[in-house]
A protein has these predicted regions:
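Cyclophilin-like peptidyl-prolyl cis-trans isomerases
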Residues: 1-164
Length: 164
């Protein structure tokens, strides 16, 4: 289980599903152990869809130094996790037809079941089991026209990520 301790003092607990996406879970846990997510904020907020984090630059273009293989149907992996509310999935470069192995450190959390259109094209690998109210508060932070938060606040800043 992963815990995001937000700068606001709130927490988000996420259960991982290595039986569906073992390489993705292994990579995510490694990044947590290394402190990679500490001090990073949720840089993209799309109300009714997703909140996205894991980019050390905060621009949507950064990541870790290592890409991982896509663990989803379009990449040849039978991942049965559906992108429903609370599901954790890897963001990646590319589209529905290319860039399958470009996931690195950026991730998103689904805000509702409208994310099911992503099934088979993005590696879902966990689910929020406690703190969905925190996720929903993050989703309500004001954004600009590019879905970026207008300012980095304690509500969207991950103070520390840990394995619990």
């Amino acid at each position: 289980m992963i815990r995001f301790e937000m700068q606001s003092g709130d927490t988000i607990d996420i259960e991982l599903y290595p039986e569906e996406a073992p390489k993705t879970c292994e990579n995510f846990e490694k990044l947590v152990r290394e402190g990679f997510f500490d001090g990073i904020h949720f840089h993209r907020i799309v109300p009714g869809f997703v909140i996205q984090g894991g980019d050390p630059t905060g621009t949507g273009t950064g990541g870790s130094k290592q890409n991982i293989p896509g663990e989803f149907r379009a990449a040849g992996v039978d991942n049965k996790i559906s992108h429903e509310k609370g599901v954790l999935s890897m963001a990646r470069s590319g589209s529905y037809t290319y860039g399958f192995d470009t996931a690195s450190s950026q991730f998103f959390i689904c805000l509702d079941d409208s994310c099911k259109a992503l099934d088979g094209y993005y590696a879902a690998f966990g689910k929020v089991v406690d703190g969905m109210d925190v996720v929903d508060r993050i989703a309500s932070v004001p954004t600009d026209s590019g879905d970026y938060p207008r300012m980095v606040t304690d509500e969207i800043l991950i103070r520390r990520a840990s394995i619990i």
